[in-house]
Curated annotation (Swiss-Prot):
The keyword Nucleus applies. GO terms for biological process: maturation of SSU-rRNA from tricistronic rRNA transcript (SSU-rRNA, 5.8S rRNA, LSU-rRNA). It is found in: Nucleus, Nucleolus. Belongs to the AATF family. This is Protein BFR2. It comes from Cryptococcus neoformans var. neoformans serotype D (strain JEC21 / ATCC MYA-565). Residues 14-174 are annotated as: Disordered. Residues 31-47 have a biased composition (Basic and acidic residues). Residues 83-92, 99-144 have a biased composition (Acidic residues). InterPro entries: AATF (IPR025160), AATF/Bfr2 (IPR039223), AATF_C (IPR012617). Keywords: Nucleus.
Length: 463
C-alpha cells in the first residue's frame, strides 16, 4: 500500500471489484497435497474378526437389509463439496451450512478410524454374547424394520390417514351412543327402584299375633253392641205408625241371642234381617205417596229460591249436595284414620311439596301469582305522553330495547330471599330439618347403609 499514490488508493476504495480473500481456499491446497492411502496402510494392527452372526443372517436370508446399496454410502471430499457450491447466491445464503459441512467433513475424515474401531468392538461384543442371546431376539430384530416401513407408507398415503381418522370418529360416536344408552338405562333403573321403595313404604306392616285371644274378645264386644243397636231400632220402628198402617204389620216377635255361641248368633242375625225386610215391604205402599208428596213440595220451593237468589241459598246448596256431602263425610273419616296411621314424613309430604313448589315458582318468577302481577302492571302502564310537557307539545318516547339491559335491577316484592329460603328448609318436618326427616324415613332399614346413602346425597332428600 505504501508504493501506491493517494489517487490510486482512493480509486481502489471506490471501485466495486474489491478482492476479498477466501479463507476456505486453504483447504483445497490441503486436499491437493493429501497423501492417498494404499490398501490397508496404517491398519496392520487391526484384527480380522469377520461379520457377526446377526449381520450374516440379515445379509444372507434377510434380503440384504444391512448390506443393500442404500446403506453403502458415498465417498466424497472437500474439493467436491466446494465445487458443487460455487454459486454466489448459495454461498451467501448457506455460509452456516458450509461451515457445518466443513465440520462434518473434518469429523468424517478424522473419525473414520474411530467408527471402524467401534464397529469392530460391536462385532466382538456380539460374538461374545452369542451364547446368551436366543433366536427370539433375532426374530425381533428382523421384524423391527417392517413396522417402520408400514408407518412411512401410511404417512405418505393421505387417503389411508383420512380413512383411519374417519374410523376413529365412527368408533368414538358409537362409544358415546353406548354411553348415553347406558346412562338412560341407569336412570330408568334408579326411578324404578325409587318407585318400588316408595310403594314398599306404603304397604301396611304385618299384623301381630293374637295375644290372649284379643281378637275374639273384640269381635264379641262389637257383635254385642250391634245387637243392642238392632233391638233399639226395632223398638223405635214399633213405636212409629204410618197413616193407613195397622198395628199387626209392625208387631215383631221376640228375638233371643245367646252370647258366646256362634251358631245361635248367626241364626239371630238372619232372623233380624228377614224381619227388617218384611217391615220394609209392608210399609212400602204407605211410604211411597208420602215421599212423592213432600218431594214435589221441596222441588217447587227449590225452583222458586233458585230463580230469586240464583242458587245463593245455603239450604239449596245443602239440598243439592246432600248425597255428595254424606259420601264426602264418610271418605273424610276414612282418610282421617289413614292419616292418623301415617308417619310424620308421609302425612306432611303433600304440604311440603306444595311449599317447595311455591318457593321455586316465586324464585323463578313463573306461576299464577307472577301472571296476575304482570296483568296488573300492564293495566297500570304509564302513558306514552309525558305529562310534564305543555299542552301544545307532548313528549312521546319509547324505551330502546338495548337500553333495557342497563336498568337497575328491581328486587321482587313478593320474592323469597336467601335467608327466608334457609329458614323454610331449616323449619321443615317440625324444626328438625332435612336430616331429621331422612332419619325418620330410614326406620327399619339398615343404619349403616342409610347413613352412607345420606352422606353421598349430602343431606338432600328426593321425594
Amino acid at each position: 500500500m505504501s508504493g501506491l499514490s493517494l489517487a490510486q488508493q482512493l480509486k481502489q476504495l471506490h471501485s466495486n471489484n474489491v478482492s476479498v480473500p477466501d479463507p476456505e481456499s486453504a483447504y483445497s491446497n490441503l486436499d491437493s497435497h493429501d497423501i492417498q492411502r494404499k490398501g490397508d496402510e496404517g491398519r496392520e494392527h487391526y484384527v480380522d474378526v469377520g461379520p457377526s452372526r446377526l449381520r450374516m443372517e440379515l445379509g444372507g436370508t434377510g434380503g440384504g437389509t444391512l448390506t443393500g446399496p442404500k446403506y453403502e454410502g458415498v465417498k466424497t471430499g472437500r474439493m467436491k463439496i466446494f465445487d458443487d457450491d460455487d454459486d454466489d447466491d448459495d454461498d451467501r445464503e448457506g455460509n452456516g451450512s458450509e461451515e457445518g459441512s466443513d465440520g462434518e467433513g473434518d469429523e468424517d475424515e478424522d473419525g473414520d478410524e474411530d467408527d471402524e474401531d467401534e464397529e469392530d468392538e460391536d462385532e466382538d461384543e456380539e460374538e461374545s454374547d452369542e451364547d446368551e442371546q436366543g433366536e427370539d431376539e433375532d426374530e425381533d430384530e428382523e421384524e423391527q424394520p417392517q413396522p417402520r416401513a408400514n408407518g412411512s407408507k401410511q404417512a405418505l398415503d393421505p387417503v389411508a390417514s383420512l380413512r383411519n381418522s374417519r374410523l376413529k370418529d365412527v368408533e368414538k360416536g358409537q362409544a358415546i351412543r353406548k354411553q348415553k344408552a347406558l346412562f338412560e338405562s341407569l336412570i330408568t333403573l334408579r326411578i324404578t327402584f325409587q318407585k318400588a321403595l316408595t310403594a314398599s313404604n306404603t304397604v301396611p306392616p304385618t299384623l301381630p299375633e293374637d295375644p290372649e285371644n284379643e281378637l275374639a274378645y273384640k269381635k264379641a264386644s262389637i257383635l254385642k253392641s250391634l245387637g243392642e243397636l238392632n233391638e233399639r231400632l226395632f223398638t223405635l220402628r214399633e213405636s212409629i205408625s204410618l197413616p193407613g198402617e195397622l198395628g199387626e204389620d209392625v208387631s215383631l216377635g221376640k228375638r233371643k241371642r245367646a252370647e258366646g255361641d256362634d251358631a245361635q248368633g248367626q241364626a239371630y242375625w238372619i232372623k233380624a234381617a228377614k224381619e227388617s225386610l218384611g217391615i220394609a215391604d209392608r210399609s212400602h205402599p204407605q211410604l211411597l205417596p208420602i215421599l212423592n208428596k213432600w218431594s214435589s213440595k221441596i222441588q217447587a220451593a227449590s225452583l222458586q229460591l233458585g230463580s230469586k237468589q240464583a242458587g245463593g241459598s245455603k239450604f239449596l246448596q245443602q239440598m243439592k249436595n246432600g248425597a255428595g256431602g254424606v259420601v264426602e263425610a264418610i271418605e273424610s273419616g276414612i282418610n282421617s284414620k289413614r292419616e292418623a296411621e301415617k308417619t310424620l314424613m308421609e302425612s306432611e309430604e303433600t304440604g311440603y311439596r306444595a311449599l317447595l313448589r311455591e318457593v321455586i315458582e316465586s324464585r323463578s318468577g313463573s306461576g299464577p301469582a307472577a301472571d296476575l302481577t304482570h296483568l296488573r302492571r300492564e293495566k297500570k302502564k304509564k302513558r306514552e305522553a309525558e305529562r310534564g310537557g305543555s299542552k301544545g307539545r307532548k313528549l312521546r318516547y319509547t324505551v330502546h330495547e338495548k337500553a333495557q339491559n342497563f336498568v337497575v335491577p328491581i328486587p321482587l316484592s313478593h320474592g323469597w330471599h336467601e335467608e327466608q329460603v334457609d329458614e323454610l328448609f331449616s323449619s321443615l318436618f317440625g324444626g328438625v330439618g332435612m336430616k331429621g326427616a331422612t332419619a325418620e324415613k330410614t326406620v327399619g332399614l339398615d343404619v349403616g347403609t342409610a347413613d352412607e346413602g345420606l352422606a353421598e346425597l349430602g343431606g338432600l332428600r328426593v321425594f
